[in-house]
Amino acid sequence: MQTLGVVPRLFPPIETGEKTSTIRWREDRIAPGYLRYVCDGDAARTAIVWVTRCTDLPLSQAAAFVRRETEWPKEIMLAGMREHYPEIRWNDIVQIVEHLTPAETLLRSDFSG
């Protein structure tokens, strides 16, 4: 199963299903299928989700793609991404990973936990 570490601040929205996408830059590729999120600093805290789609596009289009352009204007989006990727630029290509919530993932007929 694919595994992805997440900073503690972002873990609760994944667990509750509020966060159903993540944006990555210059990291190992994620593919559709099962993904285990692991909370950085607390490896026992995990959430399993089903990745439904992975899309490459410029960072400048990412907020609109995940329907969060109101919450993430350019300055906020860049500042947030630069917390994790200090060298990222507005036109760099990112991978957007979209997934079901953990609760929706549990309902899949092939889920084995």
Where are each of the predicted segments found?
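Structured alpha/beta reader/binder surfaces that contact nucleic acids or chromatin modification marks
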Residues: M1-G113
